[in-house]
Amino acid sequence: MSAMPKKFIVITSINHPTKALRTFSQLQDWQVVVVADRKTPTDWELANVKILTIEEQEALPLQTVKCLRWNHYARKNVGYLYAVMNGAELIYETDDDNIPYDSWESFFPLDLDGDVKVCDDSPKFVNAYHHFCDAHIWPRGFPLTQVLNQPGSTQLLKRPARKIAPVQQGLADLEPDVDAIYRLTIGKPITFSKNTSLYLAPGTYCPFNSQNTLWYPEAFPYLFLPASVPSRVTDIWRGYIAQRFLHMQDKGVLFFSPSVYQERNYHNLHHDFIQEIELYTRTEELVSVLDAYHADYAGIMEQLLQHQFVQQEDVDLFKAWISDLTQLGAM
């Protein structure tokens, strides 16, 4: 049996193999891992894809598995840890309805040497989508109070001299990641500009999701998805948390032109709207709490519990996550 690749694609799915998964399964040098949930078909199978069945997950030597609820998007946490267990050098995450373009693997190096577009003298929140199109559109999790503000100016800058981007967020064409308010009131398909990238310097925030996202090893600890919040919230909260801890290390997030297009699975938009309420009402408060936090990463869930962003369940789950990463030598 050939050795498992060191580059992983992590997905959780409750559907039979989709067009996106069949396409990803054909990529060379990448190991696709699908994390099953209670709703996943028991006969799920696809060549070149590792399906982590319920039984296999429960047999893993991971404390996180024992604490993690079923039927939640946070099931992806098991896939991240499985990748780390198997020596991951890169972790890419997506969903089963994001189909890669032929140019999908055109990622950026960790150290963005040379010129790159950087937000200059920007406000706290930057709508990255405005730098890839002229449409009235904003990413899921972007504060509604900031939607009508002008985008921050950008320049091609050589400073900061080093621009380190351990997390890189690709956009998605056709059905990009937007909130239910956008879909209910505008709902237009979008095609973003090509060959464009935007680095958000430390101190500048934009929500990023789990739908087309590359993580380098130094950011692996920040992959943790909370389970006590709705699935429409978990990756956005995770993204803001990750940005805060990257900023503390003088690092940032890179956004780049779409490497996938989305043929979106069915969603009840009214249900999405209800799930997203805290994104509409508490995002700025969350970032204020994060910016005021200066202790280590291991204590962040306790801090968020005090401000009622998560429940005790996530404090316990996060302790298990930190314990597992420590045992795996990834902390």
Question: What is each PLM-predicted segment?
Answer:
Residues 91:
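Short aromatic/hydrophobic "clamp" motif used to bind/position activated sugar donors
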Residues 97-100:
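Acidic metal-phosphate-binding loop of nucleotide-sugar-dependent transferases
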